[in-house]
Amino acid sequence: MAEEKQKKSVLEKALKRIEENFGKGSIMILGDETQVQPVEVIPTGSIAIDIATGVGGYPRGRIVEIFGPESSGKTTLALHAIAEAQKMGGVAAFIDAEHALDPVYAKNLGVDLKSLLISQPDHGEQALEIVDELVRSGVVDLIVVDSVAALVPRAEIEGAMGDMQVGLQARLMSQALRKIAGSVNKSKAVVIFTNQIRMKIGVMFGSPETTTGGLALKFYATMRLEVRRGEALKEGKDVIGNVVNVKIVKNKVAPPFKTAQTYIIYGKGIDREYELFHIGVDEGVITRKGSWYYYTTLKGEEVSLGQGGSNVVQFLKENPQIAEEIERRIKEKYGLLRQTEKEPEKADKSS
């Protein structure tokens, strides 16, 4: 007993010296209730992907990678995240390494262009230095880097076209992420990197696909989303969009390998009401009787949503209050409701 007290006393003195030398919070007891906080997130803009992440969105203070083939919806997901961050009153930045941002499309997705910070860097070092400065400022909530493949090292740009520059980009990413990872956690910002897929030559077994920029991003990313283009969405004979299949291949804040299916309409982005209809039916929030669909409100009133899926989607677009109520009910089922979203529900019940 005396030995345990002595150990405790020595430990307390050691902790005190560490805090004096390195500042308060440099070391802490994990079980201390004042230190353990629920994971804060920025919503993805898709309720299906919010559910798949397990925490309701992209975790703050972490690095996220969204990767997939060309035209699979990576930039669209990143822009939706920016729109969600801005809705929460946050500051967002877009590092356009590809020099391909379409402002009109971004605006259609709900991005406030007047408050969006944008940079079109000349080379990879400049892009990552800008990211580091924004993170260290502590006032930027979301930073999107589009894309890792376009982060060309300065030496490669200044060299001749045929010069062999082995591993330059991988070394650049490794060095930058070592700097950024620590400051991201303190700033509570989310840094999203979009990335492209390349083929490994000579692979006989397993997947030949890999992402650009070396292995560093795979290690430092808390969450990695694999995005794949699915079947086309048609209105009559016209193709108006496509299904996007998302798989959470890495997740440090919730169980990984969950999948989600979302729907992107060309020129408009993710169709929220289309998602609500499909998830609502799957979760029993929306009931079906024959070809008609119904929803029972929090007040106990049964509302007819329409006959056939397309009419239900149109009804939800025209009645945003019911759409929001259905969304809250779905999120509640998965335990994803934030405190700010619980208040309207309580108000409805009290009335």
From Swiss-Prot:
Cellular compartments per GO CC: cytosol
Location within or outside the cell: Cytoplasm
Claim: DNA damage is one of the keywords in the record: yes
Biological process (GO), any one: DNA repair
Protein keywords: ATP-binding, Cytoplasm, DNA damage, DNA recombination, DNA repair, DNA-binding, Nucleotide-binding, SOS response
Binding site for ATP: G68, P69, E70, S71, S72, G73, K74, T75
Top-level taxon in the UniProt lineage: Bacteria
GO molecular function: ATP binding; ATP hydrolysis activity; ATP-dependent DNA damage sensor activity; damaged DNA binding; single-stranded DNA binding
Pfam family, one: RecA
Residue ranges of coiled coil: none
Family: Belongs to the RecA family.
Known function: Can catalyze the hydrolysis of ATP in the presence of single-stranded DNA, the ATP-dependent uptake of single-stranded DNA by duplex DNA, and the ATP-dependent hybridization of homologous single-stranded DNAs. It interacts with LexA causing its activation and leading to its autocatalytic cleavage.
Full protein name: Protein RecA
Organism: Thermotoga neapolitana (strain ATCC 49049 / DSM 4359 / NBRC 107923 / NS-E)
Gene of this entry: recA
